[in-house]
Swiss-Prot record:
Belongs to the complex I 51 kDa subunit family. Its EC number is 7.1.1.-. The keyword Ribonucleoprotein does not apply. It comes from Rickettsia rickettsii (strain Sheila Smith). This is NADH-quinone oxidoreductase subunit F. The lineage of its organism: Bacteria, Pseudomonadati, Pseudomonadota, Alphaproteobacteria, Rickettsiales.
Length: 421
């Protein structure tokens, strides 16, 4: 369990003001110039040593990602913060944007300095109107105080941070589709290589990071890499914001140590499963794009490696709890409709496959399929998985794979009951 003094996001639930004065009282912008004076290599190495892995879902080493940026270039390079949070079941970045905007802005400054970027863009989901307003107010405060802009914090480093609002497309959460949108084009993923670190925004080297990944950086640098690395488990260090929703007594967002038990997380912070743990049916542990886990696997540790071993993934940390009253087949069919709607249509397997899967899933809800079609559906998900430019095809396939893997008997019972009728 995370100690109170180890929490990074002390205003996660908005009990205090999010303005600059209150943020400074909570420790934001404390000796930021001293951190910048330590140099770029120090910041990158410290983040590497901390073991911080991307909090947007991929789990790639943040410090390693920064080190890929070319050095001593004459042309511009950019930092882009992905605040296009659109994953069903996920609302962690939204609370950071609402209640801890200065943590994010200070993190943007430090990360921009570390990679040599004088310009940073925060790409925020279009529907996040109030959150965008809070960020813009915080940016205005930071500019007025000289914390960002020309000679940021008196360090001699110039850093401009811009807020860019998206238009509600889930696909723009994919880093290269986000760059396309930022350039004023249709948000469609790019082929890789070239990777953004070599050819990103406007053809310049670019690093794209998640909101939470950037917001924890100032605290890591102040308290030290060893402090952050001492929380959680080896290779899964630090704290993480988990979003707990669905059939629990008290849905909430909570910051906890990586590696905490899923059961402990739900019972300690969300008041337990509605009707008790025995009433649990399944949990989606990391946002809608990861396979669900049946009750028998729901005492797993919440970290990248443990969940991968269990056949799922940590993803965004969006925990969706489903009790015995859930029509699990319909729940996954509803997710299939989401991915069909959000496919950009660029890749044939995703464009055609997501629609086909949704249509079969809706027949499956009624039981109006043959048993052989279960395997046919599974084969189609595997044909889509890994055969698209971005991971949306995988995200559409994995929930269905998890359903068939763990609830095949329920699907077959549905088919049998339909045939009897």
């Amino acid at each position: 369990m995370l100690k109170e003094e180890d929490k990074i996001f002390t205003n996660l639930h908005g009990q205090q003001s999010h303005d600059l004065k209150s943020s400074k009282k909570r420790g934001d912008w404390e000796n930021t110039k001293a951190l910048l004076d330590k140099g770029r290599d120090f910041i990158v190495e410290e983040v590497k040593k901390s073991g911080l892995r991307g909090r947007g879902g991929a789990g790639f080493s943040t410090g390693m990602k920064w080190s890929f940026m070319p050095k001593n270039l004459e042309k511009s390079c950019y930092l882009v913060v992905n605040a296009d949070e659109s994953e069903p079941g996920t609302c962690k970045d939204r609370d950071i944007l609402r209640f801890e905007p200065h943590k994010l802005i200070e993190g943007c400054l430090l990360a921009s300095f570390a990679i040599g970027a004088n310009n940073c863009y925060i790409y925020i989901r279009g529907e996040f109107y109030n959150e965008a307003s809070n960020i813009q107010r915080a940016l205005d405060e930071a500019y007025k105080e000289g914390l960002i802009g020309k000679n940021s914090c008196g360090s001699g480093f110039d850093c401009n941070i811009y807020l860019h609002r998206g238009a509600g497309a889930y696909i723009c959460g994919e880093e290269t589709a986000l760059l396309e949108s930022l350039e004023g084009k249709k948000g469609m993923p790019r082929l890789k290589p070239p990777f953004p670190a070599g050819f990103g925004l406007y053809g310049c080297p670019t690093t794209i990071n998640n909101v939470e990944s950037i917001a924890v950086v100032p605290t890591i640098l102040r308290r030290g890499a060893s402090w952050f690395a001492g929380i959680g488990k080896p290779n899964n260090t630090g704290t993480k914001i988990f979003c707990i929703s669905g059939h629990v007594n008290k849905p909430c967002n909570v910051e906890e140590a990586m590696g905490i038990s899923l059961k402990e997380l739900i019972e300690k912070y969300a008041g337990g499963v509605r009707g008790g743990w025995d009433n649990l049916k399944a949990i989606i542990p990391g946002g809608s794009s990861v396979p669900l886990l049946p009750k028998s696997l729901c005492e797993v540790d919440m970290d990248f490696d443990s969940l991968r071993t269990a056949g799922s993934g940590l993803g965004t940390g969006g925990i969706i709890v489903m009790d015995q009253s859930t029509d699990i087949i319909y729940a996954i069919a509803r997710l299939s409709k989401f991915y069909m709607h959000e496919s950009c249509g660029q890749c044939t397997p995703c464009r055609e496959g997501t629609g086909w899967m949704w249509r079969v899933m809706m027949r499956l809800v009624k039981g109006n399929v043959t048993k052989s079609e279960i395997d046919e559906l599974l084969n189609v998900t595997k044909a889509i998985e890994g055969h698209t430019i971005c991971a949306l095809g995988d995200a559409a396939a994995w929930p269905i794979q998890g359903l068939i893997r763990h609830f095949r008997s329920e699907i077959e019972a549905r088919i049998k009951s339909y045939s009897v009728v």
